[in-house]
Regions:
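Beta1-alpha1 glycine-rich phosphate/pyrophosphate-binding loop at the start
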Residues: 1-69, 157-178
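Short hydrophobic core segments
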Residues: 4, 94-106, 145, 224-234, ...
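Mid-to-C-terminal Rossmann-like scaffold of FAD/NAD(P)H-dependent oxidoreductases
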Residues: 6, 19, 272-369
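A Rossmann-like FAD-binding core segment of flavoenzymes
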Residues: 23-25, 64-66, 70-90, 94, ...
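Rossmann-like dinucleotide-binding cores of NAD(P)H-dependent redox enzymes
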Residues: 34, 52-56, 141, 150-206, ...
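Glycine-rich dinucleotide-binding loop and its adjacent helix/turn
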Residues: 103-161
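FAD-site-proximal beta/loop scaffold in flavoenzymes
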Residues: 116-140, 208-217, 222-296
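C-terminal catalytic lobe of FAD-dependent flavoproteins
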Residues: 216, 220, 224-248, 321-387
Length: 387
């Protein structure tokens, strides 16, 4: 078994294979020099000086005990589906019987003039957080481009580090795909009460500077000073290798419920996979799909059950949880129940279709998070939720 990628999906696939097949050879290849680690931790702990060991999913010993061979810090440059071989940048060829394609995704950096300057960083790898930590002593002003979960987490970390922080969101509201307008507004108020300035519905004209970034110029001509610009504009699946090898690609590598691709003996999972037209690129989905791909590669009859897309955010001295469909389909008629406490900055909103729960937003008090995740799966009735 050869696994391409050392993220959540690749790691979960390796573990699932070993549970079923104790003797087959398992090789895992990553282009980062570190053991597979918990990527969502990066923005949550920009300032925590984390070591590789602290965010690793397993210790080096675990891979040795499980007899999983790691090839770290190497790029895969080719995939030959006829010969069933993987080619590495140093010319090494590895034969596979079953291949798991889990190459994840990269940050999308919009083509804004000036984006290639020093001081413009997308937080995607451990190396990026190290870079930010090294720059910080010289940084007073930070601009974060993107008002999603990761952007706001990064903004809060920078604020705690003593910088003045501005968040720019191109959409008319924060987290518009997951939150309704009132919740987006509440999140903006909370952020601003913590001293983070938020601009929604903006256009970015250019990143100013002379090789080192010095500011961000908006479409209306306003200029914001910045020695550090963090980009958090979503991700794009890594599909180049799969495409060159002739696998079916849409926005990501197309898979069925067993995570099989269009080519026999090749499975894909995680951020780089797309199932039933959907690619959420979220951590729980990568873990789940990895397990299924690993099981299927061993000939097991596992099937992927869609993970409900949920979003949780901790920071700004508040917490947020949103899951399901929060009134996003203009052709449907939703019933809603809303509870608001502006003083304590608490907000709860429940969305129902045909009297059954389809979406939840909690801000401030998220103690019902586990209960609501269950209720969404069970399509709970209105009466059961709104007591």
């Amino acid at each position: 078994y050869v696994i391409l990628g050392g993220g959540a999906a690749g790691y979960s696939a390796a573990a699932a294979i070993r549970e079923r097949d104790k003797t087959g050879s398992v090789v895992m290849i990553s282009n980062e020099p570190y053991l597979p680690y918990n990527r969502p931790m990066l923005t949550k702990s920009l300032m925590a000086d984390l070591t590789e060991e602290q965010i690793a999913m397993q210790s080096k010993e675990w891979y040795e005990e499980q007899n999983i061979h790691l090839i770290l810090g190497k790029e895969v440059t080719g995939l030959d589906t006829e010969q069933k071989e993987v080619l590495l940048e140093d010319g090494t060829k590895l034969a596979y019987t079953k291949l798991i394609y889990a190459l994840g995704s990269e940050c999308f950096i919009p083509p804004i003039p000036g984006h290639e300057q020093e001081g413009v960083v997308a937080v995607r790898r451990l190396a990026d957080t190290r870079k930010i930590e090294n720059m910080l002593p010289k940084v007073k002003h930070v601009v974060v481009i993107g008002g999603g979960v990761l952007g706001l987490e990064a903004a809060w970390e920078m604020k705690k580090a003593g910088c003045s922080v501005t968040v720019l969101e191109l959409a008319p509201q924060l987290m518009g795909r997951q939150l309704d307008e009132a919740a987006g507004e509440m999140l903006k108020l909370i952020s601003e009460s913590r001293g983070i300035s938020i601009h929604t519905g903006v256009q970015i004209a250019e990143l100013e500077g002379n090789g080192n970034v010095t500011g961000v110029k908006l479409g209306d001509g306003t200029s914001l000073p910045a020695e550090l610009v963090l980009v958090s504009c979503g991700v794009r699946a890594n599909t180049q290798l799969a495409q060159a090898a002739g696998l079916e690609i849409d926005r990501a590598v197309v898979v069925n419920e067993k995570m099989e691709t269009s080519v026999p003996d090749i499975y894909a999972c995680g951020d780089c996979a797309q199932f039933k037209g959907v690619n959420y690129a979220i951590w729980p989905q990568a873990v789940e799909q990895g397990k299924v791909a690993g099981a299927a590669a061993c000939g097991d009859e596992a099937v992927y059950e869609t993970v409900p897309a949920a979003l949780s955010f901790h920071g700004m001295k508040t917490a947020l949880f949103a899951a399901g469909d929060n009134g996003k389909n203009p052709n449907l008629i939703y019933r809603t129940a809303e509870f608001k406490d502006l003083g304590r900055k608490h907000y709860q909103k429940y969305y129902f279709l045909n009297n059954r729960l389809c979406g939840v937003i909690l801000i401030g008090d998220v103690s019902r998070m586990a209960e609501m995740t269950q209720a969404l799966e069970n399509h709970a009735l209105y009466q059961e939720i709104v007591k």
